């Protein structure tokens, strides 16, 4: 079993975090290639307006994707805790419970988004010259929510057992497939933005199926028996208690980004295209923070399950050092050469769009350290079993992002739009650090006594 699971309760915390984070980072980057491939190929072969159409739905895609990722990660926190405690039967029941809940909620999300998508696009002031393509694109993505759910649930289960490499391998395969499908559907069949959406959904579905095949073939520990499906109300309740706040936290963030997108849409399709290109660059560079957060959720869950609180402290410290170091490198890169990646996305109005891309990348680069703090501490705290506290940080992000977005909309300011996310990161990061110190210095001592005296 050593090849398919990883015990994070022993060994060097820094080494463990690095070895676990790197495959997740690569996997997340390849997952971003789904959307980046769409944007690059659409922008190059269809045009700037088509790129703006895809980009104008980016915040809605983040709402969908974020809800799915947050929920499935939350459902499997209990899986990691049971695994860390050595309760294998309980662990399998949490897997069954997560599967049932994910299917039902995924079905509900699919119907809801498809029913209300057109009013939502109107509410966001989507420019009329890109509305039709934007609507077709996001409707196809909404129809593929269960495909997203399948991959993210199974990859979260594998990560709960300490396996972050297998999801990466399947993501690489599906990312390459997505690019091939993009080229065929957009260039050969001239399907435009809808073709890009179809390619994305198909590739995501295949990555999920590959994860399922691997689990059935290689991991007997996850082969569910009839009795494992007798989940029980207590497991469902705990999974919903952790999973829904994590999903809602992403949703709160997405609502804030939708406010930013609405303010941006007022400025016209050219700036929407520029912001889209800049956001794609940002998303690739910042996937390291998402990976660190995912690692800390698993690390925290396994170690709290094992009752090893001093090791939890060590892990937070190690990951914070890692996050700060990466931030310095990433900020230097994105603020100096990031703008030249604009050439990947557009062939027309390049000078205007590149200038706008550069403004955005420089605005966010100064605030990468707060972004690292947000991801590490939010997910780490959730891994310890605290679902509601990090959601308060999500509210802080919404307030920071929303206030700046409203001002930007009123002033019709592109710079204001660019500063909305940094404002959210600073507010949420400060709040999460305060929460962490409260949990470790007050609540954990009540639970475990003077744990500092333990090994």
Regions found by a protein language model. Name each.
Residues 1-21, 79-144, 188-244, 300-367, ...:
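Short alpha-helical transmembrane segments in multi-pass integral membrane proteins
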Residues 8-45, 59-74, 78, 103-110, ...:
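N-terminal transmembrane alpha-helices
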Residues 19-38, 140, 151, 174, ...:
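Transmembrane helical elements of multi-pass membrane transporters/channels
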Residues 42-62, 128-133, 193-194, 235-242, ...:
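Interfacial/gating helices of multi-pass transporter permease domains
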Residues 51-111, 148-167, 274-338, 371-393:
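Small-residue-rich hydrophobic transmembrane alpha-helices
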Residues 63, 178-183, 208-212, 284-287, ...:
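Hydrophobic transmembrane alpha-helices of multi-pass small-molecule transporters
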Residues 72, 141-159, 167-175, 196-211, ...:
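Short runs within selected transmembrane alpha-helices of multi-pass transporters and secretion channels
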């Amino acid at each position: 079993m050593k090849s398919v699971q990883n015990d994070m309760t022993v060994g060097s915390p820094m080494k463990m975090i690095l070895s676990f984070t790197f495959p997740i980072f690569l996997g997340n980057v390849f997952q971003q290639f789904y959307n980046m491939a769409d944007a690059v190929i659409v922008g190059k072969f269809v045009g700037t307006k088509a790129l703006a159409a895809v980009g104008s739905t980016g915040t809605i895609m983040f709402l969908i994707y974020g809800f799915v990722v947050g929920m499935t990660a939350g459902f499997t926190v209990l899986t990691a805790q049971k695994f860390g405690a050595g309760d294998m039967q309980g662990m399998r029941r949490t897997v069954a419970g997560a599967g049932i809940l994910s299917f039902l909620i995924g079905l509900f999300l699919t119907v809801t988004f498809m029913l209300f998508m057109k009013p939502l696009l109107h509410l966001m002031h989507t420019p009329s010259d890109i509305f039709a393509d934007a609507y077709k694109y996001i409707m196809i993505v909404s129809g593929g929510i269960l495909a997203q759910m399948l991959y993210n649930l199974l990859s979260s289960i594998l990560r709960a057992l300490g396996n972050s490499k297998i999801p990466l391998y399947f993501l690489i395969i599906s990312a390459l497939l997505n690019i091939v499908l993009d080229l065929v559907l957009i260039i050969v069949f001239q399907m435009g933005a809808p073709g890009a959406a179809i390619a994305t959904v198909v590739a995501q579905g295949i990555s999920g199926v590959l994860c399922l095949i691997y689990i059935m073939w290689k991991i007997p520990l996850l082969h569910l028996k009839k009795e494992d499906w007798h989940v029980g109300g207590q497991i469902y309740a705990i999974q919903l208690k952790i999973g829904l706040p994590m999903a809602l936290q992403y949703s709160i963030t997405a609502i804030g980004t939708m406010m930013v997108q609405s303010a941006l849409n007022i400025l016209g399709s050219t700036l929407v295209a520029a912001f889209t290109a800049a956001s794609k660059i940002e998303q690739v560079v910042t996937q390291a923070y998402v990976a660190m957060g995912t690692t800390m959720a698993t690390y925290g869950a396994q170690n709290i399950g094992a009752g090893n609180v001093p090791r939890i402290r060590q892990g937070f410290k190690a990951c914070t050092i890692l996050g700060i170091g990466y931030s310095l490198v990433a900020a230097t890169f994105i603020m100096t050469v990031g703008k030249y990646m604009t050439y990947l996305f557009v062939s027309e109005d390049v000078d205007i769009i590149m200038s706008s891309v550069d403004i955005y990348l420089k605005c966010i680069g100064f605030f990468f350290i707060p972004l690292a703090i947000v991801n590490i501490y939010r997910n780490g705290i959730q891994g310890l079993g605290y679902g509601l506290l990090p959601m308060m940080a999500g509210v802080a992000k919404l307030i920071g992002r929303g206030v700046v977005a409203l001002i930007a909309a009123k002033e019709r300011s592109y710079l204001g739009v660019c500063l909305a996310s940094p404002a959210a990161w600073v507010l949420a990061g400060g709040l999460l650090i305060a929460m962490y110190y409260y949990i470790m210095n007050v609540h954990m001592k009540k639970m475990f006594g003077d744990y500092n005296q333990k090994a």
